[in-house]
Amino acid sequence: PGASLLDKVSAKIVTVKVDNKEALMHTVSPENIAHRVGVGVRHAGDDGSAAFRIPGLATTNKGTLLGVYDVRYNSSVDLQEHVDVGLSRSVDGGKTWEKMRLPLAFGETGGLPAAQNGVGDPSILVDTKTNTTWVVAAWTHGMGNQRAWWSSYPGMDMNHTAQLVLSKSTDDGKTWSEPINITDQVKDPSWYFLLQGPGRGITMQDGTLVFPIQFIDSTRVPNAGIMYSKDRGE
């Protein structure tokens, strides 16, 4: 547990025995096989959460590592459930990580319990022109704790369809804005469900911000695509 991320573990097969007898062996890779040490950033039970899933990782212009993920408080199941978007921040290349932040959490919005205001499957993007960091996720309001994939319907308002929301940080991931709902800008009203592609987005050379998306169209068929902004996310 105390190993450094810079450490490596090397292994080499010297002999192989079958029925306690040394077998003929052809060495494919004569050099030692080296693996880096993996360090768990989040573990079941941390911060009172049953599970952490759907990670994404980005590096800011200052070299800060920002890792996002679902904070699944009650179990590891998908939305709809009590789920927030968590973020871990490291300024030393991943050796140590600061206390978890919550860029997106909806609590008891609209008078419904947190388990019917889940937000998750995040994607993160660093605008390399400004060092503004964006996190996008799907917010599901209501749905009676049914799986969001089948409980989001055509329309635009939060009582009928999942909402696409953003949060941004302009101080290298230390603090985060209130949720920014962009559903009206990017969703076709005929689609059943629109959400981001979990993981990370990119900044193109001309400054265009690009996030992967997925959506269920009017035929109930899942599709993949992108959404983009040419005005710094405005």
Each language-model region and where it sits:
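Asp-box/BNR beta-propeller blade signature and adjacent active/binding-site loops
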Residues: 18-19, 23-234
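Accessible peptide chain termini
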Residues: 1-2, 234
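Generic N-terminal initiation segments characterized by hydrophobic and/or small/turn-forming residues
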Residues: 2-3, 183
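Short glycine/proline/serine/threonine-rich loop/turn segments at secondary-structure transition edges
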Residues: 3-11
